[in-house]
Each structure stands twice: as C-alpha cells, then as structure tokens.
A protein has these predicted regions:
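Alpha-helical transmembrane segments of multi-pass small-molecule/ion transporters
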Residues: 1-311
Length: 311
C-alpha cells in the first residue's frame, strides 16, 4: 500500500472510530433522541457556518478571481449532472413519496468536508486544499438548498409547494454566501477572527459523526441491510457519479489537478449532514443512516481503487 492509499484508508478508519463512539454512547444510554436533535441543530446553526467562513479567513493564499470562478463553475456542472442523474434514477426505481428525497440526497451529496479534504491532501498535498475549498462552496450551498428541499419534501409528504423560503434561508446558506463574497473580494488571512471561527468550526466533524453513530444505535443489526433501492443509491454515490463526472468533465477541464480533485470529491460516501437534516425535518432517518454506514464502509475500497485507476 503506497503512502497516498494508506492516508486515504487511515481517514476512513478515523471516521468509523468516531461513528463507533457515537454508537457506543447510544447503547450506554449516554445520548438520547433530544440530545441528537439538539446537537444537530447546533452544528447546522453555529459550528458548520463558522467552519465555512473560517476556511476562507484562515487561507494564507487564494487563487486569482478567474481561477476561483472557473473552479466554482466546474463544480456547479458536476453537481448539476449528479442532480439530474439522481432525479432520473429515483424515477426509474419508482421511489415512493416520503423516501425519494432521501435517496436523491444520498446519490448527490458526499462527505466532502470530513473525508474530502484529508483525502485531497493525502493525494496532492496541502497546496491543493484551496481548490477543494472552492469546490466545497457549491456543495454547501446546494446541500442546504436542493438537499434540504429533497429531505423536507419527503418529511411533509408533498412536493415543493410545501417547502417555503425559510427552508433555504438558513445560517449555513448565509455563511456560504459570505464565504463566496470574501473569496471574490480577496479577503483572507484574518488571524484573530479566522482562528476563532476555525476553533468553533472544529467541533463540526466530531459532533456530526457522533450524531450519525448515535442514530445508528437506534437500528437493530438486521435493519442495516436495506432494500434494492438503497443499494442502487449507494452504487450511484460511490461508482456511477465519479465515473460519469470523470468522463464528462474531462471534455471541458484541461488542468489534470482540477479534474482529479473534482472527480475524487464526487466519490465520497454519503454526507453525514444528511442525518442531521433528517433529524431537523423529521424525515426518513433510518434510510440515510443505512446509506451513510454502507457507503462509508465500501469507500474503504472504492476510493483507493478510483485513485489508482485515474493514475
């Protein structure tokens, strides 16, 4: 196993250990449903917005505006492609109302924040992280607009007519807008404010993973298996989406570094924030938990294989 592959594998193991801690806390009755919901709201309203804005203010160097805009647009193309594929697949699977939104979320949104950044660093070095941060901006915006719509419409058992503007006007969305404006204006490397936000944002990853593990503690082992729709969604997240993006984006992206980072970020397992959104909107939490568990486990193999195939 080479250094890059070992670094990727190590990040996956770290993720599982934290999820396992949350699982153990639930089994030991150290966490409750009220705790899970409260911690989820804290992450979505406070620590995640702090992490997003802090990622820009802590940067010592930003690419030029042209590069920022180009990288941002490439990432938007990737997400537009994944959203279109998810809509088609859930229609072909005849996913029922009340569940189709969660399946769409699982197909489109990967765990970019926790796994994506360390994996990118392990493969291309820390200098590549600024591009990963730029690619993460569309993720944060779309995850809490389109992704929130997917899950909220599931919970309400209706279409988009039941989802109001408040679904999209959240602290996370506002922080994404602030981060994009700061990056375009070239405002960065603000030590005091950046450090404060970074310290607060550092709570996001362990807190989110503890919620995932605690929620898994509500499921019996036999309930983790899932059905055919779940497995199709997992395969789409780990295999179909990165391969499709590799083929399509290679037609418009000339820089192999940018292309590689884009493809690898689309190969991450299901985003753990899906669990918190389901908690917030009282949606189908068990399905997204199963998807998070299985895609994280299987990504121990799929991500290293993808990196090797891409060369």
């Amino acid at each position: 196993m080479n250094t890059d592959t070992l670094g990727i594998f190590t990040q996956m193991v770290v993720l599982f250990l934290i999820i396992g801690t949350g699982y153990g806390c639930k089994k030991a009755h150290l966490t409750t449903a009220a705790f899970d919901k409260g911690l989820s709201n804290l992450v979505l309203s406070v620590t995640l917005p702090a992490m997003i804005v802090g990622s820009v203010l802590n940067s010592t160097q930003l690419p030029g505006r042209t590069d920022i805009v180009a990288a941002f647009l490439y990432s938007c193309v990737a997400y537009a492609l994944m959203i279109a594929v998810a809509l088609v697949l859930t229609a072909l699977m005849r996913a029922p109302i009340g569940r189709r939104g969660v399946l769409r979320f699982m197909m489109v949104f990967g765990n970019v924040g926790f796994l994506g950044f360390p994996v990118i660093s392990a493969i291309w070095g820390s200098d590549a992280l600024i591009y990963a941060a730029i690619f993460n901006l569309p993720f944060n915006f779309l995850c809490f607009t389109v992704g929130a719509w997917f899950i909220a419409s599931d919970a309400q058992g209706q279409g988009m007519e039941k989802v109001t503007w408040r679904t999209f006007c959240t602290p996370t969305i506002l922080s994404c807008c602030v981060a994009i404006v700061l990056a375009l204006l070239g405002i960065h490397n603000v030590p005091v404010i950046g450090s404060a936000l970074d310290t607060l944002g550092a709570m996001t990853t362990p807190a989110a993973l503890l919620v995932v593990g605690s929620q898994l503690g509500n499921l019996a082992p036999r309930e983790l298996v899932g059905d055919a729709r779940l497995w199709v969604s997992c395969a789409a997240r780990l295999v179909l989406m990165p391969l499709l993006n590799w083929v399509v984006l290679s037609l418009i992206v000339d820089d192999p570094l940018i292309l590689g980072i884009l493809v690898v970020t689309t190969a991450m397992p299901v985003a753990n924030v899906g669990t918190m959104l389901c908690q917030k909107y009282d949606a189908d939490t068990p399905t997204v938990l199963r998807g998070t568990f299985w895609t994280t486990l299987l990504s121990l193999v799929t991500i290293p294989v993808l990196v090797l195939v891409m060369g």
